[in-house]
Amino acid sequence: MSWKTPRVEAGELHEPHSALRIALDSPAWFAWLADERHRSFHFAHPAGDCTARKERKQRGDWYWVAYRHVHGRVVKSYLGKSECLTEARLCDAMRDLAERCARL
């Protein structure tokens, strides 16, 4: 199946239509996150999947937010700035989203 959004699975970022693989928490990962051209990725996790999007605050700073759709509702979790978005932070956010979605 064809996909357009970059995916994070098994500790690696996979670019669509490319053999490029970037290990999470590597300098290349943080550079990819900081690149203005990259605004979203899909994150697959045992606690559930989400879409992470880069958004701009009113002050002009960029940060990442995880989104999941459940029962017609959108649940989101703040991920942080590009330089702070580690694999551990992503996993913590997925567990938080899973707990919150279970209460809906």
Model regions: which residues?
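A structured, charge-rich N-terminal accessory region that forms the first stable segment of a protein
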Residues: 2-15
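Short, Arg/Lys-rich segments that mark the N-terminal edge of DNA/RNA- and chromatin-recognition modules
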Residues: 3, 17-21, 30-80
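Short, surface-exposed linear segments at secondary-structure transitions and domain or protein termini
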Residues: 83-93
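Short, solvent-exposed cationic patches
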Residues: 91-104
